[in-house]
Each structure stands twice: as C-alpha cells, then as structure tokens.
Amino acid sequence: MLSKGKIIYPQRGEIYLVNFDPTIGSEIKKTRPALILQNDVSNQYSPITIVAALTSQFTEPLYPTEVLIKVPEGGLQVDSVALLNQIRSIDKQRLIKRLGVLESVTIEQVDRAIQISLGLVNLI
C-alpha cells in the first residue's frame, strides 16, 4: 500500500478498512474493516496479506469461528465480529487505511477461532 510515496506494512492484529469488491457468490462484500492475520515478516515482503472480514451485523450467541470486538478496540466505531470463516488473501492495494490494533487477549481469541475454522483442534 502506498501513502504519499511511503510503503506501509500492515502488522498482524491491526484492523484496516478494506475494499473487498468485486466478489463472487457468498464471499464477503463491500468496503469494511478487516483484521490482518498474516505474520509480520510475510507482510513486510509479500504484496499480499491474509485478512478476516469484520461485520457489525451479527446475532448472539456467536459461532466458535467468530470473535466479538467491542468499541473502541481496534479503532472501531461500532461493535463488530471477526469472521474467521471468511479468511481471505488479498493484494495490499485493497487496504484503504489503518483503523487500530487489537488487544493481546482478543488476538488469543482470534487464534483459537482460526484453529477451529481450519480444523486444527477438536470442538469436543
């Protein structure tokens, strides 16, 4: 991502406003906040990054692959849910602006939800 000629490297745990369009089918759509999941070394050298979309439209109880992020954490203006079942690789050109960063306790919840989403742990 370029800003005034300066290259900016997203870091794991940061929230960015991301343009997800165009999409196909049930993929998450429109410009919305997303959580950077990719490690910092890859974020420094790769033109792509891995993100999880956020939504402010959710119902409780949450699924095991969802993590609640309450205002003002991450620079969000409304309570939102990280959708760890909507993990996606994107070109960094889709990153619009940095909103904030998650607290370590929330990142731990995200890590657990990723493990569940990818089948790396048993739910039982």
Which residues make up each language-model segment?
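Short, charged beta-turn/beta-strand-edge "cap" motif at the junction between a beta-strand
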Residues: 21-25
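A structural motif
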Residues: 34-35, 51, 84, 110
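Compact nucleic-acid interaction/catalytic patches
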Residues: 26-30, 36-72
